[in-house]
Amino acid sequence: MAKEVFQRTKPHMNVGTIGHVDHGKTTLTAAISIYCSKVNKDAKALKYEDIDNAPEEKARGITINARHIEYETAGRHYAHVDCPGHADYIKNMITGAAQMDAAILLVAADSGAEPQTKEHLLLAQRMGIKKIIVFLNKLDLADPELVELVEVEVLELVEKYGFPGDTPIVKGSAFGAMSNPDDPEATKCIKELLETMDSYFDLPERDIDKPFLLAIEDVFSISGRGTVATGRIERGIIKVGQEVEIVGIRETRKTTVTGVEMFQKILEQGEAGDNVGLLLRGVDKKDVERGQVIAAIGTITPHKKFKASIYCLTKEEGGRHKPFFSGYRPQFFFRTTDVTGMVSLEGKEMVMPGDNVDIVVELISLIAMDKNVEFAVREGGRTVASGRILEILE
């Protein structure tokens, strides 16, 4: 069957659901998908099981890797990432957040904000997300007086992490909407959420004029066609027949893009902001991996050593309890990759939680990087600092 061509009739935006495990992120994603399929006859409804689609996820009922679905509202085309809330999988949440323009923060009305709610807000802020909408879920299970307290608490938290004080809150039950898609009362919260997304989220300015760059999120082998790398186009435009370079982790190599697709539809060209799959000529699946980037030839180089300015989270923000010294070896998260690096302090003996400081980092492998790129620093399963590259040293 020939694939259909993706029609660009509405502005495209990437959103995602973030929040604590079991607060209902995947249920909300499914409820949106089902609601949009009722309103728009072309849309495909995805059930909870379709979104949580890895065997381990079905067994545990939690999302491990970020999942993508698409839907349309009256005014926009959305790509929606369902981000994992489970602590072990927060690094996949970082990959998901790196692809979002805006986020929907889920908070269960019956339990309020929890540790991961804070960590996700911090990561969203570090990944450059400017606006969020709060979806207060499980309203049917919560004491009405408690709901008001949760609202106040959540808005305080949202402001603390640098999001606007007038962040909208939509209240409802994602499970109710998913289970009763034909009941207007049950789906009212989904309708309100989508309308709020259209009106409150600003369409991002896309770097279409800059050289092409995509950070690889996943790699697949399609029999008879070759190797496909997926990810979000960070900047520029890509067309079939274009020569590109695969940079980072391994030796830089050239290849040609022989196909561009989004959500199983053919794209005439991929643009900044699109989540795409690129078919690569003559590249074996084992030669490409998550964390590399695909870029216009000669526009980005791999490096190991750089100077950066970082902010170390306090104990209250979920960071370290003790200072660190030269020789500290945490993981550095760039775009879709995490790599161990060694920290050197210059003119400073130690770094305390809560400090803003400049450091020199030497990574154990070469990563495609440029100035001003932001990164997260993690250790032992938690985010301990966030930073930005000031200068590339080697």
Swiss-Prot record:
<dbReference type="InterPro" id="IPR009001">
    <property type="entry name" value="Transl_elong_EF1A/Init_IF2_C"/>
</dbReference>
<feature type="binding site">
    <location>
        <begin position="82"/>
        <end position="86"/>
    </location>
    <ligand>
        <name>GTP</name>
    </ligand>
</feature>
<keyword id="KW-0963">Cytoplasm</keyword>
<dbReference type="InterPro" id="IPR041709">
    <property type="entry name" value="EF-Tu_GTP-bd"/>
</dbReference>
<dbReference type="Pfam" id="PF00009">
    <property type="entry name" value="GTP_EFTU"/>
</dbReference>
<dbReference type="InterPro" id="IPR000795">
    <property type="entry name" value="T_Tr_GTP-bd_dom"/>
</dbReference>
<keyword id="KW-0460">Magnesium</keyword>
<dbReference type="InterPro" id="IPR009000">
    <property type="entry name" value="Transl_B-barrel_sf"/>
</dbReference>
<dbReference type="InterPro" id="IPR033720">
    <property type="entry name" value="EFTU_2"/>
</dbReference>
<protein>
    <recommendedName>
        <fullName>Elongation factor Tu</fullName>
        <ecNumber>3.6.5.3</ecNumber>
    </recommendedName>
</protein>
<dbReference type="InterPro" id="IPR004161">
    <property type="entry name" value="EFTu-like_2"/>
</dbReference>
<keyword id="KW-0251">Elongation factor</keyword>
<feature type="region of interest" description="G2">
    <location>
        <begin position="61"/>
        <end position="65"/>
    </location>
</feature>
<dbReference type="InterPro" id="IPR027417">
    <property type="entry name" value="P-loop_NTPase"/>
</dbReference>
<keyword id="KW-0479">Metal-binding</keyword>
<feature type="region of interest" description="G4">
    <location>
        <begin position="137"/>
        <end position="140"/>
    </location>
</feature>
<keyword id="KW-0648">Protein biosynthesis</keyword>
<dbReference type="InterPro" id="IPR004160">
    <property type="entry name" value="Transl_elong_EFTu/EF1A_C"/>
</dbReference>
<feature type="binding site">
    <location>
        <position position="26"/>
    </location>
    <ligand>
        <name>Mg(2+)</name>
    </ligand>
</feature>
<dbReference type="Pfam" id="PF03144">
    <property type="entry name" value="GTP_EFTU_D2"/>
</dbReference>
<feature type="domain" description="tr-type G">
    <location>
        <begin position="10"/>
        <end position="205"/>
    </location>
</feature>
<keyword id="KW-0342">GTP-binding</keyword>
<feature type="region of interest" description="G1">
    <location>
        <begin position="19"/>
        <end position="26"/>
    </location>
</feature>
<feature type="binding site">
    <location>
        <begin position="137"/>
        <end position="140"/>
    </location>
    <ligand>
        <name>GTP</name>
    </ligand>
</feature>
<dbReference type="InterPro" id="IPR005225">
    <property type="entry name" value="Small_GTP-bd"/>
</dbReference>
<dbReference type="InterPro" id="IPR031157">
    <property type="entry name" value="G_TR_CS"/>
</dbReference>
<dbReference type="GO" id="GO:0005525">
    <property type="term" value="F:GTP binding"/>
</dbReference>
<comment type="function">
    <text>GTP hydrolase that promotes the GTP-dependent binding of aminoacyl-tRNA to the A-site of ribosomes during protein biosynthesis.</text>
</comment>
<comment type="subunit">
    <text>Monomer.</text>
</comment>
<feature type="region of interest" description="G5">
    <location>
        <begin position="173"/>
        <end position="175"/>
    </location>
</feature>
<dbReference type="GO" id="GO:0005737">
    <property type="term" value="C:cytoplasm"/>
</dbReference>
<feature type="region of interest" description="G3">
    <location>
        <begin position="82"/>
        <end position="85"/>
    </location>
</feature>
<dbReference type="GO" id="GO:0003746">
    <property type="term" value="F:translation elongation factor activity"/>
</dbReference>
<dbReference type="Pfam" id="PF03143">
    <property type="entry name" value="GTP_EFTU_D3"/>
</dbReference>
<keyword id="KW-0547">Nucleotide-binding</keyword>
<keyword id="KW-0378">Hydrolase</keyword>
<comment type="similarity">
    <text>Belongs to the TRAFAC class translation factor GTPase superfamily. Classic translation factor GTPase family. EF-Tu/EF-1A subfamily.</text>
</comment>
<feature type="binding site">
    <location>
        <begin position="19"/>
        <end position="26"/>
    </location>
    <ligand>
        <name>GTP</name>
    </ligand>
</feature>
<dbReference type="GO" id="GO:0003924">
    <property type="term" value="F:GTPase activity"/>
</dbReference>
<dbReference type="InterPro" id="IPR050055">
    <property type="entry name" value="EF-Tu_GTPase"/>
</dbReference>
<dbReference type="InterPro" id="IPR004541">
    <property type="entry name" value="Transl_elong_EFTu/EF1A_bac/org"/>
</dbReference>
